[in-house]
A protein has these predicted regions:
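Flexible, solvent-exposed loop/hinge segments and secondary-structure transition points
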Residues: 1-167
């Protein structure tokens, strides 16, 4: 597994913010964690409110800790609250259970890090995060369609993302 570079991390965040501007999102914040859960980069747009670092980090950390998009971690919390309570205690409450956290994978599907984005509705946080990942030629779980590869990589696919503000 190759490491995620600082240059890639900063480029992912820049592309995430560009997508947010394109979609007319509220001020965003984004964090990149390496595969070991350590902070690689964080940025907060002007006008973003407080606690954004902690929220972004919690979304990305939840994705890494449980190997799935943070919106699927939220679904698991609803299915198995005792499991998630125990996991939260083990993680010193470091996980934030909302959409906006995505695993970052290389071309082979190995996890090289995670992104956490917050500032708008969860779906838009995810859409912008995935745009950032794609901008540097990396992949999210949404990019894998081969059933054998999905099984091998233990990918859990979330339902397709759409902008809920356009309903």
């Amino acid at each position: 597994m190759r490491a995620l570079s600082l240059e890639q991390a900063n480029a992912i965040i820049a592309a995430t913010f560009a997508a947010a501007e394109q979609h007319k999102c509220r001020p965003m914040s984004a964090i990149i964690l390496d595969a070991g859960g350590r902070v690689k980069a964080f940025q907060k747009q002007d006008g973003a409110s407080m606690l954004r670092f902690e929220i972004c980090q919690g979304k990305a950390y939840a994705s890494l800790a449980l190997g799935r998009a943070s919106r699927l971690v939220l679904a698991k919390a609803k299915e198995k609250p005792l499991f998630m309570q125990s996991a939260g205690e083990l993680a010193d409450q470091a996980m934030f259970l909302e959409g906006g956290g995505q695993l970052i994978r290389d071309a082979e599907g190995e996890v090289v890090g995670a992104i956490g984005v917050t500032g708008d509705v969860n779906e838009m946080d995810d859409i912008c995060a995935i745009a950032g990942i794609h901008a540097v030629g990396l992949k999210s779980d949404y990019d894998f369609d081969d059933p054998e590869q999905i099984r091998k990589l233990s990918i859990l696919k979330a339902p397709p993302l759409t902008d809920p503000r356009k309903k």
